[in-house]
Amino acid sequence: MTAGSDALAAEVRRALALVIDPELGENVVDLGLIYAVAVEDGVARVEMTTTTPGCPATAFLKEAVQAAAWGVPGVHYAEVKLTYEPKWSPAMMNEVARRNLDSR
């Protein structure tokens, strides 16, 4: 990756932070649901998971992540790959999400 694609990947990650998990009310980045973001030749590739394989919000989250990535200037196409390896756990959340969920 080049410095430009690294910067664009960082922009995509910031855009993904606007996608809120409807069940937990926190964004997918802080929840640790985004495993990888890469951009090459205007194509954003996002690898993500959900909290459980049977998550009822899976389709919504995948579509919202794709739309958020695609909305970043310089991204001409966005691919989202859903994976359950490694399996998500609450330990993957950052401190902000953990604190917000603990206060509810």
Which residues make up each language-model segment?
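Domain-level signature for proteins that mediate thiol-based redox and metal-cofactor handling
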Residues: 1-104
